[in-house]
Amino acid sequence: MKIYHVEAGMLATNCYFAVNEAIGEGVIFDPGGDYPTIKRMIEQTKAKVVAIVLTHGHSDHIGALAELRKATGAPVYIGEDDADCLTQPNRNLSFFIGEELKNEPADHLVHDGDVLELAGMKFEAFATPGHTKGGFCYYYAPGKVVFAGDTIFCESIGRTDLPGGSYRALIQSIKTKLMVLDDDVKLLPGHGPTTTVGWERRR
């Protein structure tokens, strides 16, 4: 797997494109906004988008979803408890950026322990509530990489003061789902630089 990355949208959300180069297919994680930038990244890879996976439903992670979905026809995956974020602006908090963001419902609802088999790759779904009720991280074990959304950042954690947030739940999620992984597992956050489990464990 090769991972491509752009910062997209006014909050510089990390959008990742995980590509299986052997078959020319890939998975987009968190198309946060600025569709033209995401489109250019995809075109440069020459890979086909076969799935769009969302770590959670906040507007800064789904801002370009409608355009990407229309352009690719790829199915959308989101945690069950964040599903209504796609259709309800009050849940995705788009009013914070002066918009009323609405999308069609997701094609697939993700549950803790699910294994998403996409583009010839397997991603383990870890429910990590705390930043949102339905937040998820996705672990690609062969590459020792976690697409972590806003659960954890380099030397920080996601906000818990927004609707559906819980500091206690977030800390529990990080301890039981992420800190049990090997030190050299990379954490690809929703904002800011990449970190590792080992680095965050030593903090």
Question: Where are the regions a protein language model picked out?
Answer:
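Conserved S/T- and glycine-rich ATP-binding loop of Class I adenylate-forming
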Residues: 18, 55, 128
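Metallo-beta-lactamase
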Residues: 92-95, 121-203
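Structured loop/turn residues at beta-strand edges in well-structured enzyme cores
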Residues: 1, 47, 119-121, 183
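Active-site HxH/HxHxD metal-binding segment of metal-dependent hydrolases
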Residues: 33-118, 203
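Short, glycine/acidic-enriched loop or turn micro-motifs at the edges of active sites
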Residues: 22-23, 33, 59, 134, ...
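Conserved beta-strand hairpin/beta-sheet module of binuclear metal-dependent hydrolase folds
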Residues: 1-45, 137-149
